[in-house]
UniProtKB/Swiss-Prot annotation:
This is Anthranilate phosphoribosyltransferase. Anthranilate 1 binds at G79. HAMAP family: TrpD. Its EC number is 2.4.2.18. It comes from Helicobacter pylori (strain J99 / ATCC 700824) (Campylobacter pylori J99). The lineage of its organism: Bacteria, Pseudomonadati, Campylobacterota, Epsilonproteobacteria, Campylobacterales. The gene is trpD.
Length: 335
């Protein structure tokens, strides 16, 4: 541990062996709170490399139980969170809609730290059992194309280090790791990051982890694709990373103000979700969610481009099938 800290104090990247050793010690609770705080801050100041992030994720995955084998190319749209803008839960609503369209969504997530409602909070408030056992999860997934993996159930190191990380008053490597350690190891990911500078780093980390197809995005300072500002994207395609910007025009949608997406409390988040699924949501809410679903359809080769993905999503919402689909997920999660 001393050598690892010394390397970080001298602004040196850790090699693979050092990262694996460090995170094994963290998992085994052999790192003191003072040492963990020092490591996280030193990594933050140095700047985490994509290799450090990917090896840390691999180590955490090696120690996480895998609930079941699906045999499918699974999709996740878990983001880092941490943008602090308190918007509706775009990614979770998008995952529910995408699964109602037949995409195999293995949604990894946790409770909110900086927003009114994280993915776990929203689903729980909707009535979904967020702590499904492996049998329930597999059954729910097979019958609905949707499964929620509550991160603290699979990664105790996240749960146990949470109080210390909160006291640091800064984002750490743990924020980056959250979207990378889904125990079902999805091969397709739409990953939102809280800072534009992380897009390329996280895309490289996904590539190193063996993800086949991905898009890492930051839209106007949020960890989502947005319509009120430019969304910066790094797309992993054919083992190459393409970097570009997206605007509302790329989705054939009008722009909307960020304020229209912001909510005051968790209750508003639930109502926004239900309204969208029943095709009676505010245009600003429905359209930004449609843009995110479109990206999932595009990454999954279900839509030839983003505009077609939006058109498919909006037509599907007219049927109100996503609302009935949510009721099915709620029922299956408690079965």
């Amino acid at each position: 541990m001393k050598d690892i800290l010394n390397a970080l104090y001298h602004q040196k990247d850790l090699n693979d062996e050092e990262v694996k050793k460090l995170f094994t010690l963290i998992i085994d609770e052999k790192v003191s709170p003072a040492q963990l705080g020092a490591v996280l801050c030193a990594l933050k100041i140095k700047g985490e490399s994509f290799k450090e992030i990917s090896v840390a994720a691999t180590t955490l995955l090696e120690h996480a139980p895998k609930p079941f084998n699906s045999g499918l190319d699974l999709i996740d749209n878990c983001g880092t969170g941490g943008d602090g803008l308190k918007t509706i839960n775009i990614s979770t609503i998008a995952a529910l809609i995408a699964s109602s369209m037949g995409l195999s969504m293995a949604k990894h997530g946790s409770r909110s730290v900086s927003s009114h409602s994280g993915s776990a909070d929203l689903l729980e408030n909707l009535g979904v059992n967020i702590e499904m056992n492996p049998m329930q999860l597999e059954n729910c997934f097979k019958q609905s194309h949707f499964g929620f993996l509550f991160a603290p159930l699979y990664h105790q190191s996240f749960k146990k280090s949470a109080p210390l990380r909160k006291e640091l008053f800064t984002k750490t490597i743990f924020n980056c790791l959250g979207p990378l350690i889904n125990p079902l190891r999805p091969k397709i990911q739409l990953l939102g990051v809280y800072d534009k500078s992380l897009c390329k780093t996280m895309a490289l980390a996904l590539k190193a982890l063996g993800v086949k197809r991905a898009m890492v995005v930051n839209g106007g300072g949020t960890d989502e694709i947005v319509l009120h500002d430019i969304t910066h994207a790094c797309e992993l395609k054919n083992n190459e990373i393409l970097e570009y910007d997206l605007s509302a025009k790329d989705f054939d949608l009008p722009p909307y103000d960020l304020k229209e997406l912001q909510i005051e409390n968790a209750k508003e988040s639930v109502q926004a979700c239900l309204d969208i699924l029943e095709n009676k949501g505010k245009d600003s809410h429905t359209m930004v969610v449609a843009a995110n679903v479109a990206s999932l359809l595009y990454l999954s080769h279900r839509a030839k481009d983003l505009k077609e993905g939006v058109s498919m999503t909006l037509e599907h919402l007219k049927t109100k099938a996503p609302y009935a689909h949510l009721q099915k997920i709620i029922r299956l999660s408690h079965a």
